[in-house]
Amino acid sequence: MTERVVLAYSGGLDTSVAIGWIAEETGAEVIAVAIDCGQGGEDMEVIRQRALACGAVEAVIADAKEEFANDYCVPAIQANALYMDRYPLVSALSRPLIVKHLAEAARYHGATMVAHGCTGKGNDQVRFEAGLAALFPELKVLAPVRDSGMTRDKAIAFAEEKGLPIDVTKKSPYSIDQNLFGRAVETGFLEDIWNGPIEDIYDYTQNPAEPREPDEVVITFTAGVPTALDGKELSPLEIIQELNRRAGAQGVGRIDMVEDRLVGIKSREVYEAPGAITLITAHQELENVTVERELARFKRWVDQRWGELVYDGLWFSPLKNALDKFILEANKHVTGDIRMVLHGGRAVVTGRRSEASLYDYHLATYDSGDTYDQSLARGFIDIWSMPAKIANMRDRRLS
């Protein structure tokens, strides 16, 4: 029986050429699997037909937008996931979803191999292969670009030789990855970290200086899950899409950073994530209102570690799964509304309300109606400062 390979297919040059290359090198049949994570661009049916025209024996399209929003983006919002305090894990979140579908397709079609088009310098090779090792360790992984020296020039020559239906005349100077949660741009002139980004590289966001009028929005959360905009109930997918539009129109969510890659190098990345940044900012503020101080302090550490695990390709690890449960528990009272003004590239919180609020006006006010017993402060301070007081008295005695 002929072996089968499941290929993570994007419709681009490298993975289109990989179909024929894998067939020639291994003699295996190639099944192309393309996952719709809300990246937009070409129609998915056009991509499917291209895979077949390039030699795939079967081409599968999975509409995973709802799944991506519910099972990957929402947990990231609940975890306030910002790698290095800035990057909302745009690409990193989609990789375990793609891995899950690749593993399912491999089982369904009886494949013995899985292939991807990642290079040997990026994080994605690790995310794909670590995920596959966790879900389907029996599979052999092929990486033509990394392991077989498939350069762009070689890929173009192969496509022309075989008459593959791929437009190879247009080449963006950038490497771009995008999905529902945002857009990542790298390489080209951005590799000189002194060069400022130009407006041409942006697609999800307008120039922050252009909109004259601000946009006010009220975001509703239920147990940390976004459930409504301006009082209208919507799915997480619809909310992210709408905030991509509205926050993007105000230039919100532009990020230009030098990032510590998993593979040991620093890389300059430009991101656009208008919906993600708006939702994470709103969620953080609602946590400030509804989560007790010690839990909030510890959750900040958990959130950071959760983001690092996802960035590092360990979505399916025991630690990440355990942290998921903690984050869900910590979000059980994160229910309420956050009002924000979107303008000038910023999403600014201007109001908060929650039935689960820990903010007590009568305890916080300095006006009449204050119920805080200030006479308790002196005793509290004496006890709170006692360990440091005793230690310093000892140090003076011994010096």
UniProtKB/Swiss-Prot annotation:
L-citrulline binds at Y87, N123, R127, S175, E259, Y271. Keywords: Amino-acid biosynthesis, Arginine biosynthesis, ATP-binding, Cytoplasm, Ligase, Nucleotide-binding. Pathway: Amino-acid biosynthesis; L-arginine biosynthesis; L-arginine from L-ornithine and carbamoyl phosphate: step 2/3. It catalyses: L-citrulline + L-aspartate + ATP = 2-(N(omega)-L-arginino)succinate + AMP + diphosphate + H(+). L-aspartate binds at T119, N123, D124. It is found in: Cytoplasm. PROSITE patterns: ARGININOSUCCIN_SYN_1 (PS00564), ARGININOSUCCIN_SYN_2 (PS00565). HAMAP family: Arg_succ_synth_type1. This is Argininosuccinate synthase. It comes from Thermobifida fusca (strain YX).
